[in-house]
């Protein structure tokens, strides 16, 4: 392992690598080891401030998203959350846990560097709990992708079972898998010489675990979600094109019939058309939202995961200070999801504001409420 980068991935997670790298740099300075550095390493204050900002922004954004979802359902008199909302609530839970049990303990450990004040059991439990939200977040993205694939690409099979059982099953599998994949942390870490550190027996074990971790938490979920969304986008494009053509033909036929009839039937036809348009819009909007969340997860985790693998197989290739700054990108993922949801659901965010009055036309509002309060709505 490299001269400056040997401990950044002792815990192959961005939150723990910050502590490990900073510990190494502190010991390096104490021993008066000098080497050329292209940039100054972040100070302890900067790292602590970064962790604190991640915690505050994550808690605020995800708590606000939970409030907006339930507030809108109350306004629309919907008794249950939709499948997408249910999975987004699970994502909020994973992000909140990341802030509390992943980043939070890291702040405490970083503040007490180079010592870990706690028994060996607490060391193992901390390392075990820290990675559960990371696995859960990635697996829940696959669950969202699979749910959209089932709802859009296989609608007949989806109708045979309850639309609420499917996301509950997918989210349950995601959390269970996250716990199972986190169990190696219980065996890899222990308290030694006052610090909670790894106990790899060989360099090959370290390399295999780092590569496996990054594959399971980033590469494989991204690949699976990408393939599912490729199928979803094709299905949505075909469905939208067919619906548009069908509506145009119906308009022509109905126009000929309605020219001799009263305006009441014209209003009924207009309402039915708007309902169809609203369903298509909701379908496309849902796909855009979930696809953007998956893409953001891939982009934000890519720098750290690629850096991790490079260090595992070629330790001298990357400067430790540069790798520390790269680490910051992965932590931003827990902050982004709520704001991406708000971007695609600005109307729901405005509706949740108690002081804002609705300015939607009456017929459009009625159509929207009918679509969104339908117990069979999958969006």
Swiss-Prot record:
It is found in: Cell membrane. One of its GO terms (cellular component) is membrane. It is a multi-pass membrane protein. Residues 19-48, 117-124, 190-207, 311-320 are extracellular. GO terms for molecular function: G protein-coupled receptor activity. Glycans are attached at residues 32, 199, 319. It comes from the Eukaryota. Residues 70-95, 146-168, 229-289, 344-379 are cytoplasmic. The chain crosses the membrane at residues 49-69, 96-116, 125-145, 169-189, 208-228, 290-310, 321-343. Keywords: Behavior, Cell membrane, Disulfide bond, G-protein coupled receptor, Glycoprotein, Membrane, Receptor, Transducer, Transmembrane, Transmembrane helix. Disulfide bonds join 123-196. Its main location: membrane. Disruption phenotype: Viable and fertile. Gustatory associative learning in response to salt cues is disrupted. Males have reduced reproductive success, due to a range of aberrant mating behaviors. Double knockouts with ntr-2 partially rescue the reproductive phenotypes. Detected in the left ASE gustatory neuron, the chemosensory neuron pairs ASH and ADF, and the PQR tail neuron. In males, detected in hook and tail sensory neurons involved in vulval sensing and hermaphrodite contact, and in spicule protractor muscles. PANTHER family: CARDIOACCELERATORY PEPTIDE RECEPTOR-RELATED. Belongs to the G-protein coupled receptor 1 family. Vasopressin/oxytocin receptor subfamily. Receptor for nematocin. The activity of this receptor is mediated by G proteins which activate a phosphatidylinositol-calcium second messenger system. The activity of this receptor may be modulated by ntr-2, leading to reduced intracellular cAMP production. Plays a role in gustatory associative learning. Also plays a role in male mating behavior. This is Nematocin receptor 1. The lineage of its organism: Eukaryota, Metazoa, Ecdysozoa, Nematoda, Chromadorea.
């Amino acid at each position: 392992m490299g001269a400056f980068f040997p401990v950044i991935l002792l815990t192959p997670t961005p939150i723990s690598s910050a502590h490990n790298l900073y510990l190494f740099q502190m010991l390096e300075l104490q021993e008066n080891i000098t080497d050329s550095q292209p940039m100054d390493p972040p100070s302890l204050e900067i790292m602590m401030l970064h962790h604190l900002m991640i915690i505050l922004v994550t808690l605020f954004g995800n708590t606000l998203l939970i409030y907006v979802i339930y507030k809108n359902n109350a306004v629309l008199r919907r008794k249950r959350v939709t499948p997408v909302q249910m999975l987004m609530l699970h994502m909020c839970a994973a992000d909140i846990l990341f802030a509390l049990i992943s980043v939070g303990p890291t702040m405490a450990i970083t503040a007490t560097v180079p010592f870990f004040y706690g028994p060996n059991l607490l060391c193992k439990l901390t390392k075990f709990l820290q990675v559960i939200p990371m696995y859960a977040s990635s697996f829940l993205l696959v669950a969202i992708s699979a749910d959209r694939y089932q709802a859009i690409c296989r609608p007949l099979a989806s109708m045979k079972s309850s639309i609420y059982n499917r996301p509950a099953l997918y989210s349950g599998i995601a959390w269970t898998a996250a716990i199972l994949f986190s169990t190696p942390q219980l065996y890899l870490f222990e308290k030694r010489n006052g610090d909670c550190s790894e106990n790899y027996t060989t360099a090959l074990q370290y390399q295999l675990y780092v590569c496996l971790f990054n594959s399971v938490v980033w590469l494989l979920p991204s690949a699976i979600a990408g393939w599912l969304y490729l199928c979803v986008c094709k299905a949505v494009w075909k469905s939208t094109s067919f619906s548009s053509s069908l509506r145009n033909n119906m308009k022509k036929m109905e126009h000929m019939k309605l020219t001799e009839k009263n305006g009441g039937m014209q209003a009924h036809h207009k309402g039915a058309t708007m309902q169809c348009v609203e369903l298509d819009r909701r379908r496309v909007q849902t796909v855009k939202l979930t696809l953007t969340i998956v893409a953001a997860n891939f982009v934000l985790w890519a720098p750290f995961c690629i850096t991790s693998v490079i260090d595992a197989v070629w330790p001298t290739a990357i400067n430790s200070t540069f790798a520390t700054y790269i680490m910051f990108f992965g932590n931003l993922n827990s902050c982004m999801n709520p704001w991406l949801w708000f971007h695609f659901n600005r109307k729901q965010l405005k509706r949740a504001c108690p002081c804002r009055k609705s300015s939607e036309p009456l017929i459009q509002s009625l159509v929207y409420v009918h679509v969104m309060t339908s117990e069979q709505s999958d969006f």
